[in-house]
C-alpha cells in the first residue's frame, strides 16, 4: 500500500490537490493554538477545512454574488439546500433575535430541469434557498449551518454557480454539456445518482458489498479536463433563473417582507478539476462475504435508510422527529418549520462526552441532561433521574465516544428504555457499521458517511437507519415521508462520489483495525506509564475494562474490531507539542480517512471550554489519531521516529 502524500504547510488541503477536501493541514501544535485564538495570519492561510466550519471558495463566491445582487444595505446571507431548511433557519434566527429587530428574508433559486433523457446524464434540477439577515446576525446563520449540518456542498455550489450565473440565456445544450465534460470527463453520468443512492443505502442496511453491484455499464470515470481551464475565472455573463421559482412563503419573516424572486443578470464562470478515486488493493473476497455476523437485525434499504448532506443533519433530524413525537403526546401541533422547543417537552439526555456539535445541537433545541462520564456512574445518575418520576424523551449516545473511546452499557440502556419509555439514538460514526451492530439496542442509528464509509476525505454525507422493531417506527416512517420534515438533500454528484468511495469500505475497515492494534501493541504501549512519554491511551480495548466489556457486547461477531481511532494523553504540554510536531503524517481535523490523520482534538474543539472538558477527562494535551491504510511497517517507523525525537527534549 503506497502511503498518501503528506501535507506539510499550514492551510494546505488534506488530501493534497483536492478541490473538495474535508480537512486542512495544521502542521504544528502552535498553529492550532493560533487558529483558535483567531490569528489573522493563520486564518488567511487556510485553503480548505471541514465543510460545516469552513466556507468553501465555491460557496463563498456564490454568497458574494448573491449579496452583490440581492442584499439590502448591511445584509449578509447563507445558502441552504431547500426552502424548508431555510424556513427552519429563519425560525432559529427569530428565536435568537426575539428581543431585537432582526429581519429575515428568503430568496429561492432553481436551476433548469433536463428536458430529455440525454440531458439527464449531465443536467439536474437543483433548488436552493438563500437566507438574508443583517450582518450583525451573521454568526447566528453560521451557528445554524454548523450545528444542524443542513448545508449545501461545494459541488452543489459549483453547479449552481455555473447554471445560474454563467450560462447565457442563449447558450446551447451542447455548450452546457461541454462544461460538465470539462469538469469530470465524458463519462460522468448524473443519471447514475439515483442508483448510487440505492447502493449506498443497501450497503448501510446489509453491511455487505456485492460484486454484482458494479455493472460495468453503470460505471463512470473521472477523466482530467483541460488544465488550462481549471482555475476560477471572473467572467460575468448575462444569465437567467428558472422561471419555476414560485414563492411558497408569504409571511415575509420578521420584517413582513415577501421572499425575493428577482432575476440575476450576471454570473461567474467557475470550474473544478476532476478527482480520481483510487480503489484499495485489498482482496474483495473480504468485502463481499455474505452473513459475516455484521447484522443481527434486517432492515429494508429503501424504507428504513435515509441519506443526508452531513452526519449532523441526520442527528438533527432524529431530534426533530422525537420533538414532534413529544408534541403530539402533549396534543400540541408543531409546525414542521418550527425547530424550537419549549416546556413542557421531555428532556433529552447526552450519555457520555460526545462530539461537540452533538452536544450543541441538543442543548440549542431542547433542555438536555449532560451525563458526560458515560460510564457506570452516569448510568446510576440516569437511573436516579428516571426513578425520581421525571420522564425522559431520549438518550443520545456515541458508540464509542469521541475522543475518549468510551462505550456505555447499551444492554442496560435498552432495559431502562423499555422500563421507562424513552428512546435511544446511537451515533455509530466512530465504531463503524462493520465493527459494531448497535441497531438492535437503538430506535434510530445515525452516522457520518464522510468518515470511514467514504474514506477518501473528498465528500460529505450522513445517514439515518430506523429500527423496524422500535415502538416509534411507525411514527418515524410517517414523519420521514412528509416533505415538510424530510427531503433527500444529498446532491447527486456527492452521492456518486460516496458510492464509488464506499465500494471497499468493509475491506478498508478490517485492514485499519489490524493496523491500529499493531501500532498500539508494538509501538505505543511500551511508552505508556508514569515516567514514560504517554500518560494514557484511549481505545475501546484499553480505555477501561468497563468499556471493553460494553463494546464486546455489541461487536460484530466475526470481523468486528475496535476501529481505527485512538487518543493519546501526555504528562505535559511540551512533550505533547513536540510529539505532534515530529509526526510525519497528515495533521488536521476529521477521522476515518484512508490516510493516517493526527490532531490536538481538545485544543481545537474546547480551547475556550478547557475546564469543562477536563472535568470529564478530556485533557488539554490530548492528541487524537485516526489510522489509515498505510502499511504497518511505515506507520511503525513514523511513530517510532516521533517518539525517539520527543524523548530527547
Swiss-Prot record:
User: Cofactor(s) for this protein?
Assistant: pyridoxal 5'-phosphate
Has keyword Amino-acid biosynthesis?
Answer: yes
Question: Which biological process terms from the Gene Ontology are attached to this UniProt entry?
Answer: methionine biosynthetic process; transsulfuration
User: What is the official name of this protein in its record?
Assistant: Putative cystathionine gamma-synthase YML082W
InterPro entries hit by this protein:
Cys/Met-Metab_PyrdxlP-dep_enz, PyrdxlP-dep_Trfase, PyrdxlP-dep_Trfase_major, PyrdxlP-dep_Trfase_small, Trans-sulfuration_enzymes
Please list the coiled coil stretches: none
Q: Which residues carry this modification: N6-(pyridoxal phosphate)lysine?
A: 451
Sequence segments annotated as region (Disordered): 242-273
Entry's EC annotation: 2.5.1.48
Q: Which GO terms describe its cellular component?
A: cytoplasm; nucleus
Catalyses: O-succinyl-L-homoserine + L-cysteine = L,L-cystathionine + succinate + H(+)
Amino acid at each position: 500500500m503506497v502511503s498518501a502524500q503528506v501535507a506539510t504547510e499550514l492551510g494546505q488541503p488534506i488530501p493534497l490537490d483536492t478541490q473538495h477536501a474535508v480537512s486542512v493541514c495544521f502542521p504544528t501544535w502552535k498553529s492550532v493554538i493560533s487558529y483558535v485564538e483567531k490569528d489573522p495570519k493563520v486564518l488567511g492561510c487556510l485553503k480548505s477545512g471541514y465543510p460545516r466550519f469552513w466556507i468553501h471558495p465555491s460557496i463563498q463566491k456564490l454568497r458574494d454574488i448573491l449579496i452583490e445582487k440581492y442584499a439590502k444595505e448591511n445584509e449578509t446571507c447563507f445558502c441552504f439546500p431547500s426552502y424548508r431548511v431555510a424556513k427552519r433557519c429563519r425560525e432559529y434566527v427569530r428565536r435568537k433575535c426575539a428581543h431585537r429587530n432582526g429581519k429575515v428574508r428568503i430568496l429561492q433559486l432553481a436551476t433548469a430541469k433536463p428536458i430529455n433523457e440525454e440531458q439527464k446524464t449531465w443536467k439536474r434540477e437543483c433548488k436552493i434557498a438563500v437566507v438574508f439577515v443583517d450582518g450583525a446576525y451573521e454568526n447566528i446563520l453560521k451557528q445554524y449551518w454548523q450545528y444542524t449540518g443542513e448545508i449545501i456542498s461545494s459541488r452543489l455550489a459549483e453547479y449552481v454557480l455555473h447554471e445560474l450565473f454563467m450560462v447565457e440565456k442563449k447558450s446551447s445544450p451542447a455548450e452546457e454539456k461541454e462544461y460538465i465534460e470539462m469538469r469530470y470527463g465524458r463519462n460522468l453520468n448524473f443519471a447514475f445518482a439515483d442508483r448510487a443512492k440505492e447502493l449506498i443505502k443497501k450497503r448501510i442496511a446489509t453491511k455487505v458489498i456485492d460484486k454484482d453491484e458494479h455493472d460495468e455499464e453503470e460505471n463512470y470515470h473521472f477523466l482530467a479536463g483541460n488544465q488550462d481551464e481549471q482555475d476560477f475565472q471572473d467572467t460575468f455573463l448575462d444569465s437567467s433563473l428558472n422561471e419555476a421559482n414560485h414563492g411558497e412563503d408569504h409571511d415575509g419573516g420578521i420584517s413582513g417582507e415577501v421572499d425575493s424572486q428577482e432575476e440575476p443578470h450576471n454570473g461567474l464562470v467557475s470550474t473544478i478539476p476532476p478527482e480520481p478515486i483510487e480503489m484499495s488493493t485489498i482482496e474483495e473476497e473480504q468485502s463481499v462475504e455474505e452473513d459475516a455476523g455484521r447484522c443481527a437485525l434486517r432492515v429494508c434499504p429503501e424504507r428504513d435508510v435515509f441519506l443526508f448532506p452531513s452526519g449532523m443533519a441526520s442527528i438533527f433530524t432524529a431530534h426533530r422527529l422525537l420533538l414532534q413525537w413529544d408534541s403530539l403526546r402533549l396534543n400540541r401541533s408543531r409546525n414542521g418549520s418550527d425547530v424550537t422547543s419549549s416546556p413542557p417537552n421531555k428532556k433529552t439526555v447526552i450519555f457520555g462526552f460526545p462530539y461537540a456539535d452533538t452536544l450543541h445541537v441538543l442543548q440549542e433545541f431542547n433542555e438536555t441532561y449532560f451525563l458526560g462520564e458515560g460510564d457506570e456512574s452516569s448510568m446510576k445518575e440516569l437511573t436516579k433521574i428516571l426513578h425520581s418520576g421525571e420522564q425522559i424523551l431520549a438518550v443520545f449516545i456515541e458508540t464509542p465516544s469521541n475522543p475518549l473511546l468510551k462505550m456505555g452499557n447499551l444492554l442496560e440502556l435498552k432495559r431502562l428504555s423499555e422500563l421507562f419509555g424513552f428512546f435511544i439514538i446511537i451515533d455509530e460514526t466512530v465504531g463503524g457499521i462493520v465493527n459494531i451492530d448497535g441497531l438492535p439496542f437503538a430506535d434510530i442509528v445515525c452516522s457520518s458517511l464522510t468518515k470511514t464509509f467514504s474514506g477518501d476525505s473528498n465528500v460529505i454525507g450522513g445517514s439515518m437507519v430506523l429500527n423496524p422493531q422500535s415502538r416509534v417506527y411507525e411514527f418515524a416512517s410517517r414523519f420521514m415521508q412528509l416533505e415538510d420534515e424530510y427531503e433527500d438533500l444529498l446532491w447527486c454528484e456527492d452521492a456518486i462520489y460516496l458510492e464509488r468511495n464506499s465500494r471497499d469500505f468493509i475491506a478498508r475497515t478490517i485492514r485499519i483495525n489490524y493496523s491500529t492494534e499493531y501500532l498500539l501493541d508494538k509501538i505505543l504501549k511500551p511508552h505508556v506509564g508514569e515516567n514514560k512519554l504517554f500518560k494514557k491511551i484511549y481505545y475501546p480495548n484499553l480505555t477501561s475494562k468497563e468499556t471493553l466489556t460494553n463494546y464486546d457486547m455489541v461487536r460484530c461477531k466475526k470481523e468486528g474490531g475496535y476501529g481505527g481511532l485512538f487518543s493519546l494523553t501526555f504528562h505535559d504540554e511540551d512533550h505533547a507539542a513536540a510529539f505532534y510536531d515530529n509526526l510525519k503524517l497528515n495533521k488536521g481535523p476529521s477521522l476515518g480517512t484512508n490516510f493516517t490523520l493526527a490532531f490536538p482534538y481538545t485544543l481545537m474543539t474546547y480551547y475556550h471550554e478547557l475546564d469543562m472538558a477536563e472535568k470529564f477527562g478530556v485533557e488539554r494535551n490530548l492528541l487524537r489519531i485516526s489510522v489509515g491504510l498505510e502499511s504497518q511497517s511505515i506507520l511503525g517507523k513514523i511513530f517510532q521516529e516521533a517518539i525517539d525525537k520527543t524523548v530527547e527534549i
